C-alpha cells in the first residue's frame, strides 16, 4: 500500500511539474542610443539679428533680476537741489541787455569776416590775372576786331523758281548775312522820308536846257 501511494504521489508530482508552464525569457537589452548628428540650417541675416537682440535683452533682464536689492539712501546722504536766493538772481532787464550785447558782438564779427573774405577774394583774382601772360589778355583794338568779325544774319522770304501751277506759291524763309553797307546806310539820318518818282531821260534834257537859259 505504501509503495503504491508513493508511486501515486510521484506520478502526481511528475504531472504537476509537466503541467507548470515554462518561465518567460527576460527581454533583450535595449540597443545603445546613438547621438544625434548636429544639423546646421541657414538663417537669414535679418532673423539672425533679431535672435541676437532677443538674447541680449534676456541676458540684460536676467542681470537686472540677479542684482541684490539695494537699501534706500538715508535722508542725510541724499543731495538736495541748490536754492538760489532772490538777492543773487539776475534781473530780467539785465538779462535782456546782456543778450542784446552778445547779438551785437556776433553781428560785428560776422561783418568783419565778410569784409575780410571779400578782400581775400579780390586779391586772389588780381594775382590770377597777373600770373597770366600779357598775350592772353586781349587788347582793346583786338576786342573791336573780334566784334567786327561777328556776322549778323537776317531772315528773308524767297520763292523757288519751280512753283506748282494748281496751288499757291511756296514761300521759303532764308537766313542771309547782313552787308556792312546796309548797316552804314541805316545809320545815316535822312531828312525826309518821302519817295519821289524817277525823272525820264527826255525830261532831264529839257530841264537842263531851261536852267541854262
UniProtKB/Swiss-Prot annotation:
- Indicate, by first and last residue, each region the UniProt record lists as having compositional bias (Pro residues): 21-31
Which organs or tissues contain this protein? Expressed during spermatogenesis, initially at pachytene stage with abundance increasing in round spermatids and decreasing again during spermatid elongation.
* Top-level lineage group: Eukaryota
Question: Which stretches of sequence are listed as region Disordered?
Answer: 1-70
Recorded hits in InterPro entries, A to Z, give:
ZNRD1-AS1 (IPR040005)
Bias-annotated ranges (Basic and acidic residues): 1-19, 43-53, 60-69
General function of this protein: May be involved in male sterility.
Q: What is this protein called?
A: RNA polymerase I subunit H
**Native source species:** Mus musculus
